[in-house]
């Protein structure tokens, strides 16, 4: 009887350990998986136009032109849209806005509202674009339009930002940088107009999130 009791106790301890350690093991595995994903970065180059890209990549003129034109189309689809030129200029500065092409990602009802108020809606000019390899290791290139403001009061002043408001540093073409692969993923189409200053608020929020993530990572690394 004593032996049986001993065996049962051992079995209980084994089962208890399995039940309580399994979540910990899963958590550790998840951390390693996340860390692996975070390291899946990509090196991209920032250009103002196809000529800049061609000059930096001799023999790749056709690819540069294709990437630039695709970035322009993506900008039309995903750039912040404004009901009036004044709202766009207040965010991006004089000479930095253009009328958005019809059907450029806007929902029909919002398009009608903007057209009723000003004849069309407005969007910032594409200030540059990121160019990198296609996700999945394809032979082609991926691209992402970038925007910048010339209004000193805007959070986007002198910086490159994507359509979501994520900041990629100084608006200086010719740079090479490392970004998460998600940075090159297609962005959602813009389906509503942005209020004056709304895109700047998005940039400020993104910057706060980036600083918070960096701080958390630093604290974790430091123990």
From Swiss-Prot:
Pfam family, one: DUF1190
Biased composition (Polar residues): 204-223
Bias-annotated ranges (Low complexity): 178-195
Positions of region (Disordered): 178-223
Transmembrane segments: none
Family listed: Belongs to the UPF0441 family.
HAMAP family: UPF0441
NCBIfam families from the UniProt entry: PRK11653.1
Name this polypeptide is given: UPF0441 protein YgiB
Originating species: Shigella boydii serotype 4 (strain Sb227)
Lineage of origin: Bacteria, Pseudomonadati, Pseudomonadota, Gammaproteobacteria, Enterobacterales
